[in-house]
Amino acid sequence: MLTPAVFPAVLYLLALVVWVEMFCLVAVAVVEREIAWALLLRMLVVGLMVEVGAAAAWTFVRCLAYQRSFPVLTAFP
């Protein structure tokens, strides 16, 4: 079952997959330079978004673990 503590791990695994795919795209781009660079740029943006999401999720989980020792932005104060 997915609990809030598992979300950062899942996001980090997704980020790892993205970076591995980017490495493969670089290898393809060396041989075929047409579409691989556009795909590489797209994967770079997706990878960075996943990394930022994982960092935000991990910060939120740490905050819950420390019983809100620092404030969390919420929609309804």
UniProtKB/Swiss-Prot annotation:
UniProt entry keywords in alphabetical sequence: Host membrane, Membrane, Transmembrane, Transmembrane helix
UniProt-annotated location(s): Host membrane
Main location: host cell
Residues spanning the membrane: 10-30, 35-55
Record membrane topology: Multi-pass membrane protein
Segments forming a coiled coil: none
A cellular-component GO term for this protein: host cell membrane
Protein name per its UniProtKB record: Protein UL148C
Organism: Human cytomegalovirus (strain Merlin) (HHV-5)
Gene: UL148C
